[in-house]
Curated annotation (Swiss-Prot):
There are 3 CRISPR RNA loci in this organism and a single cas gene locus. A CRISPR-Cas type I-B system. Homodimer, forms a heterotetramer with a Cas2 homodimer. Its cofactor is Mg(2+); Mn(2+). This is CRISPR-associated endonuclease Cas1. One of its GO terms (molecular function) is DNA endonuclease activity. Mn(2+) binds at residues 158, 223, 238. Its EC number is 3.1.-.-. CDD domains: Cas1_I-B. Keywords: Antiviral defense, DNA-binding, Endonuclease, Hydrolase, Magnesium, Manganese, Metal-binding, Nuclease, Plasmid.
Length: 331
């Protein structure tokens, strides 16, 4: 059976009915969801669940990503790993603790991230504006990455690149959508809200991908380990945000699949409405399922698989020293 991400927006209760998940909504509806069909479960509503439901999800290796009020990401329940490797975790921590090894991996992550930002601007240069000078600056910043000798220097180069990249958004987006500047917690306008929501989806996709390996999601290389976040997921997400989040922002806005009516402004800032979230998620899942011909694998792979391939490449690098192939847009 082909597995897919499943999103639940209803409020209610999630329970186990033999080998199937049962959803009882507050409106009195009952739905059944075969657990074998789920790659990851996303809970967007106010859902209660018991240990029997978690046991079933754990047995089938299904992660659960939980979103709170107005779809703010709250955390993930990660089931017991199908792959356990103490050696992998040891090598991951050793690489983090070794400045040279950590920088080598960090360089590849940020080089790929800047490359993918630059690829977006190259695509829109001439279509939505003249971005040639920024494209050239991003090329220079990508080259400068390998010269950094400390993680804070590396992050400074990435921050400079991202600011210049975001400065081009207002030229790419159709009015009345504007970014002005990147703001979150809370998002200050519709574009910031859309970017934040999609960045969250990319992040949780990376959490799911890492869970399928023996890598520890809390040990990153660019982002410092913290108590409340999976820093390796943040690292991998930086590679894929331009590809999966930003390109979708441009497409949704410029094709008018999303309008200002899909947002609401409150004291908490500007946020997507429920209908807006449904529209965005449908397109995001469609994007994950799209395929490209992979030059190394010699076959078509989905973007969801591309994230998984990236993570496996990092794991192989840690264990064998083979080059880490951080994903740079080639198509």
């Amino acid at each position: 059976m082909t597995k897919a991400n499943h999103h639940i927006f209803a409020d209610g209760e999630l329970s186990r009915k033999e080998g199937t998940l049962r959803i009882d909504t507050l409106e009195g509806e009952t739905k059944y969801l075969p657990v074998e069909s789920i790659d990851a479960l996303y809970l967007h509503g106010q859902i209660s669940f018991n240990t029997r439901a978690l046991g079933l999800l754990n047995k089938h290796g299904v992660p659960v990503h939980i979103f709170g009020w107005k779809d703010y990401y709250r955390g993930s329940y990660l089931p017991k790993r199908s792959q356990l490797s103490g050696n992998t975790v040891v090598e991951q921590v050793r690489a983090y603790d070794n400045t040279e090894r950590r920088l080598r991996i960090g360089h590849r992550i940020i080089e790929a991230s800047i490359h993918n930002m630059r690829a977006n601007l190259q695509y829109y240069s001439g279509r939505r504006g003249d971005f040639d000078s920024v494209v050239e600056t991003l090329r220079e910043l990508k080259t400068a990455v390998s010269d950094t000798q400390r993680i804070d220097e590396l992050r400074a180069v990435e921050g400079d690149a991202r600011k210049r990249y975001y400065d081009c958004f207002d030229s790419i987006l159709e009015a009345p959508f504007r970014l002005a500047k990147r703001e979150y917690n809370p998002p200050s306008n519709e574009t910031n809200a859309l970017i934040s929501f999609l960045n969250g989806m990319v992040y949780t996709s990376c959490v799911s991908a890492i869970r399928k390996t023996a890598l520890d999601p809390t040990v990153g290389f660019v982002h410092e380990p913290g108590e409340r976040r999976f820093t390796l997921s943040l690292d991998i997400a930086d590679i894929f945000k331009p590809i999966l989040a930003d390109r979708l922002v441009f497409r949704l806005v410029n094709r008018k699949q999303i309008t200002t009516d899909d947002f609401e402004t409150e004291l908490a800032g500007c946020l997507l409405t429920e209908q807006g979230r449904l529209t965005v998620l449908e397109e995001f899942e469609r994007s994950l399922d799209q395929t490209v011909q992979h030059p190394r694998l010699k076959r078509k792979v989905s973007f969801k698989t591309l994230i998984q391939t990236d993570v496996y490449s990092l794991k192989k690098h840690l264990l064998t020293g083979e080059p880490y192939h951080a994903t740079e847009k080639w198509w």
